[in-house]
UniProtKB/Swiss-Prot annotation:
Residues 108-296 form the ATP-grasp domain. Gene3D superfamilies: 3.40.50.1970, 3.40.50.20, ATP-grasp fold, A domain, ATP-grasp fold, B domain. It comes from Schwanniomyces occidentalis (Yeast). The keyword Nucleotide-binding applies. Pathway: Purine metabolism; IMP biosynthesis via de novo pathway; 5-amino-1-(5-phospho-D-ribosyl)imidazole-4-carboxylate from 5-amino-1-(5-phospho-D-ribosyl)imidazole (carboxylase route): step 1/1. The keyword Membrane does not apply. It catalyses: 5-amino-1-(5-phospho-D-ribosyl)imidazole-4-carboxylate + H(+) = 5-amino-1-(5-phospho-beta-D-ribosyl)imidazole + CO2. This is Phosphoribosylaminoimidazole carboxylase. The lineage of its organism: Eukaryota, Fungi, Dikarya, Ascomycota, Saccharomycotina. GO terms for molecular function: ATP binding; metal ion binding; phosphoribosylaminoimidazole carboxylase activity. Keywords: ATP-binding, Decarboxylase, Lyase, Nucleotide-binding, Purine biosynthesis. In the C-terminal section; belongs to the AIR carboxylase family. Class I subfamily. Pfam families: AIRC, ATP-grasp, PurK_C, RS_preATP-grasp-like. InterPro entries: Ade2_fungi/plant, ATP-grasp, ATP-grasp_carboxylate-amine, ATP_grasp_subdomain_1, PreATP-grasp_dom_sf, PurE_ClassI, PurE_dom, PurK. GO terms for biological process: 'de novo' IMP biosynthetic process.
Length: 557
């Protein structure tokens, strides 16, 4: 695919999966790490035995390669700058980007300068009790004390619960540069993998939800169990953050979702990330292949970061070393018995809480994924069968008041007769304007294809919804108590140019539903065939009536 040789600083599980992705593209890789590291186990090329923090070892790697990249950010950045200048080797992410992200406090300062929302933090000027007491007075207790550098999987974090716990915190994090974060109570932890091309374009994978146990990522839900608006908000924030760093590659962006729905960035990793392992099985292109494409300069086609299908759901479970040697393999065996589950082991010797591998579960519903997860972790004893996923509604029937229900339920019964999945609810343009706005904007993201809106009187609902959604809207004028529905008809049908509303006769939700089925039939032959059958049935009914009338005469008919 490309004759450039890629050198990888770090041979752990992330390096191993980068190598796997590069191998499929016939791209040669050379790994710098200790002998028999996970990445070296699956690659027969001549590697470099040494440390990614050692200048001599990095020089050896640079002499063999055209491009250098990292699977861990804790590398010798000055050595990278040296080999870049001496050998002309390309390095991605750029050394300055790696250096900035290495120091978590400087990382936050950089993001703030670029208008990115982060958790409030302050540098610890001196590792002594008085400095932390002053921070406690500023932030109150508890607050989070963190190492600025060389922190990973929660190592380097300490919760300062009270003033009395300060000496213990200093002992725990002694001899490290520190910073403190104001305590951030959050509802969920979210993450987004973002790919940055050398031209500066950014592409986001779906927003996911991460569950941590003992500061280590335990489970990832993809997509995140949040509203579409929250997922989009997190994606935009993550992309804006990654845009601020020069160079290319993949970045893992971890975030907090607060109770008020505000989203703050926790930290960023300039490499593949644990929260993106699900992409191997659930997405068009894995995070590892995306990283290889970015650093080598290969094409990034449209939607390459998307989930494989619009109904794809996935759960990633980390496999951690158990207190009892190799006991974690019991989970892997159960996963091997489970349909739609894939096991990835990293070739490591076991020790407690060490990342030994991960398991991806992919299905058409999150409910099904969770059922399989329960069996794998031992919460249930029965291997789950395939669950029939609940059909997502294709048509929405909305009305301004429950008094419109007798009219709109007729259309609902038509959709039911055709087997079209639909939802029916009340959305008032005047009494619930915020709900109407949110409903109209989010409708396409939820998979809806057509909206039927019934309204009487002023009848603003169909037009207002049509103004805020790209979906086709069908208006049903509902007969009122004063002007027999003519006012509603005129209101709906007289929409300004550019805001189309297909309007049916007064109280005729039947035709609205039939029109919705025809719209669905324009892109899905299933509904086209159903409509053809419906029309044939109507014809047969009329022909049968005509035949009987002609046979018995009008007097006996």
């Amino acid at each position: 695919m490309d004759n450039k040789i890629v050198g990888i600083l770090g041979g752990g599980q992330l390096g191993r999966m980068i190598v796997e992705a590069a191998n499929r593209l016939n791209i040669k890789t050379v790994v710098l790490d200790v002998p028999n590291s996970p990445a070296k186990q699956i690659n027969s090329n001549e590697h470099v035995d040494g440390s990614f923090t050692d200048l001599k070892s990095i020089i050896q790697l640079a002499e063999k390669c055209d491009i250098l990249t990292v699977e861990i950010e804790h590398v010798d950045v000055e050595a990278l700058k040296y080999v870049k200048e001496k050998f002309g080797v390309e390095i991605y992410p750029l050394p300055d980007t790696i250096k900035l992200i290495q120091d978590k406090y400087l990382q936050k300062e950089h993001l703030i300068q670029h208008g990115i929302s982060v958790t409030e933090s302050v540098a610890v000027p001196s590792n002594d009790e008085q400095s932390l007491i002053e921070i406690g007075n500023k932030f109150n207790y508890p607050f989070m004390l963190k190492s600025r550098t060389l922190a990973y999987d929660g190592r380097g974090n300490y919760v300062v619960k009270t003033k009395e716990s300060i000496p213990e915190a200093l002992e725990f994090l002694k001899d490290r540069p520190l910073y403190a974060e104001k305590w951030c109570p959050f509802n969920k932890e979210l993450a987004v993998m973002v790919v940055r091309s050398i031209e500066g374009e950014v592409f986001a994978y779906p927003t996911v939800e991460t569950i941590h146990k003992n500061n280590i990522c335990h489970v990832v839900y993809a997509p995140a169990r949040v509203s579409d608006s929250i997922a989009v908000k997190a994606s935009v924030l993550a992309k804006n953050a990654v845009k601020s760093f020069p160079g290319c590659g993949i970045f893992g962006v971890e975030m907090f979702l607060l109770p008020n729905n505000e989203i703050l960035i926790n930290e960023i990793a300039p490499r593949p990330h644990n929260s993106g392992h699900y992409t191997i099985d659930a997405c068009v292109t894995s995070q590892f292949e995306a990283h290889v494409r970015a650093v080598v300069g290969l094409p990034m086609p449209k939607n390459f970061t998307s989930l494989s299908t619009t109904t794809t759901n996935a759960i990633m479970l980390n496999v951690l070393g158990d207190e009892e040697s190799n006991k974690e393999l019991e989970i892997c065996r159960r996963a091997l018995e489970t349909p739609n589950a894939s096991v990835y082991l990293y070739g490591k010797s076991t020790r407690p809480n060490r990342k030994m591998g991960h398991i991806n579960i992919v299905s058409s519903s999150m409910e099904d994924c969770e059922s399989r997860l329960d069996y794998i972790i031992g919460k249930s004893s029965k291997i789950p069968e395939n669950l029939i996923p609940k059909e997502k509604p294709l048509v929405s029937i909305i009305m301004g008041s429950d008094s419109d229900l007798p009219v709109m339920s007729v259309g609902a019964n038509i959709l039911k007769r055709f087997g079209v999945p639909f939802e029916l609810t009340i959305v008032s343009a005047h009494r619930t304007p915020h709900r109407m706005t949110q409903y109209a904007i989010e409708a396409p993201k939820r998979g809806l294809k057509v909206i039927i809106a019934g309204a009487g009187g002023a009848a603003h609902l169909p037009g207002m919804v049509a103004a805020m959604t790209p979906l086709p809207v069908i208006g049903v004028p509902v007969k009122g108590s004063t002007l027999d529905g003519v006012d509603s008809l005129h209101s709906i049908v007289q929409m300004p140019r550019g805001i189309p509303v297909a309007t049916v006769a007064i109280n005729n939700s039947t035709n609205a539903a039939l029109l919705a089925v025809r719209i669905l039939g324009a892109y899905d032959y299933k509904w086209l065939n159903e409509m053809n059958q419906y029309m044939n049935n109507m014809e047969n009914e009329v022909l049968a009536k005509a035949e009987r009338l002609e046979e018995v005469g009008y007097e006996k008919y």
